[in-house]
Structure formats: structure tokens, C-alpha cells
């Protein structure tokens, strides 16, 4: 605990790092300068073994002087293809690319964690493994690549976190069990028979059939799924036609499915295709259907989550620690959880008084930078608690 509470002196450094990453964002699988910046910082820190497990990721290992468990800590580094509309002096210098999800803060936090734990290395037992991950935002994701490169070999526990705009700055949120959804994608192509819009009876109207499909898909959640199961089926694209007087031969529908159980993903895939099949057959059309499985759901381990929660309670008290409901957003942190138990918690970063009110992936998204030292405190103190408990 003593180590973490000294952090206030380096808050300015955390902010400086975060603003640097915010000014120079890079998209998924393009994090060349970001990863090099991180690598160069870590390489200057004594006692670290620093490597590049994949082209755009960085790993650092801090080996304790006594045996113990191996704890991994992860931060993601990629930005989004969004044109920033903020007006502060460190906005993105790259048009159409922006840190609109807080990953700039995640990198800064983990760099702070590295520095604080290196200062406390005499107390470290086992190994702390720091994972700076590329490409969280873009499936198939960087986590799978890092796992394939062996970064989770020998890891006993893994911890990750997200700066969270809907949670007030100063608060820490935890979720026991299923925490974040599996984000799957489906695509439907309806093949009808095109023709004159004024003579519709001679056509097989792909638009009319497509609207029936979209309407019927809403029944999956409302009538075919247990209300106690969390499921989202959202149509997000519908493309058909090029002019006002032609009924198009083809309509394309795309959307996403979000769920917290793998079994429910499989059931939903089958139900979507059943609906498409029956509707198109009824109107004499044909179809093609594809379903792409995204990241697995993030399911937090009870014991690891409890240590994070108890640590946050020790630091801040009950009024600043909350148990959140699962979110239907997706996260490839789940790839790491396939290899070791762990937890993914949330660091409050919103502040209505400062106008920090915009949601993730919004062109005016930002974070309250007061959240940065809080994130470092929770990570560092939790790791020290793991070590002291012999977990």
C-alpha cells in the first residue's frame, strides 16, 4: 500500500504520457510508433526484461528475488477511425484517427504501474508481466496474437481494466462473473427478382422481403430467448437499390449479436438463419447467410475480482467502489482469460461538471485525467495484495 500512495508526485507524468498518445493515435495493427514509444521507455528501466512478442506489441517482465506466482497486467494501445471534434490543445494530429475509447489512458496507467512496481521490486515475489497489446478494436484482435506468441505461458492470474465514461471519476467498478459480451457479426444477402417499381407483381421484391426479415429478427430476443439471458440482436446496415423506379434484385443486411454465454451464440445463429430461410422461401427468394464469431465473452474469476474489490475498498471506501452490471460491449481480453483466471475492472473517468459526458467511440470523447493515478493505485495495490496473501 505504501508504494501506491506515493503516486501523487508522478501524476503529471501520467498526464504527459496520456496526452502524447492522444496526439499521435494509431489504428489497430498499425501501432508502430506507439509500441516503439512504449518499448523505448521500458528499455530504460532497470530490472526489466523487455521484448516484442508480436510486430506491434510490447512485453516487460519484472522478476522478483523470491519465488511466487506470475501475475500479468494488460493495457490496449489502438485508436479508432473517428475524426476528433474536441478543442483542447492535444487533439489528434492525424485526421480521421482518434483515441475515442480511453486506450491512451490505459497505456499511461500501465507505464505508471511498471514504474511503481520497479520501485518496490525488493518486495516482489514471483513475476509481474506487463502486456502492452495492439489491436483490441479490430477483430480478430491482438490478444489472440499475443497468446499465440506465448505471453501467457506460466501466468497464474491476469488483470485488466477500462477507463469508463459512464462511471464517475473517483469510483472503481467491478463485475463478478460474466462482464462483457461476445460481439458476433452476421450478414444476409437476399436474392430476389428485380424489375419496374410500377409493376411489382412481376418482381420478387428484395426490399420488402428484407424488411420482413428485420422485423422477424426482433422476435429472437423478445419471444425466443429467456428474459433472464442477456442477448442483443441489432440490425445496423440495410443496403438495396440505386434509384426510385427500380425494385432491386438484391438486398444486403448486416448486424451484430451480443451475448454473455457461448451456447446462446450458437442458438442465435441458428435462429437467425431459420427466420431468413422461412421468409425468403415464403416469397420465392433465395438467400446467403454468414455468421462470424467475434471475441469470447469476458467472464471474471470470483477470487481475482474479490481481491480487486477488497483493495479498492481499502483505498477508497464503500462509497467509491461499486458492483456494476455486465455490459454488452465486447473485449478481446477474453483471449487471455482462456489461459489463466483473471478479472477486468472499470475505472471511473466521467465528470459532468467538467463537461466530460460523451460516450465511448464519440468524436468528443475524453477522460477526466484524475482517473489516471487512481488506475495506477488500484493495479499496484492489488498486485501487492496478491503477493502478501501468497495468492
Show where each model-derived region lies.
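Acidic/His- and Gly-rich active-site-bordering loop/insert found
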Residues: 1-99, 104, 108, 115-124
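Metal-dependent amide/peptide-bond hydrolase catalytic core
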Residues: 208-391
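Non-cysteine beta-strand/loop elements that form the S-adenosyl-L-methionine
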Residues: 72-74, 83, 186, 344-349
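Active-site beta-loop-alpha junctions enriched in small/polar residues
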Residues: 26, 76-78, 135-137, 164, ...
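Histidine/acidic-residue-rich, glycine-tolerant segments that coordinate divalent metal ions
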Residues: 80-82, 86-98, 105, 111, ...
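Structural motif
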Residues: 69-72, 128-129, 156-159, 211, ...
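Divalent metal-coordination and catalytic microenvironments
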Residues: 21, 60, 73, 103, ...
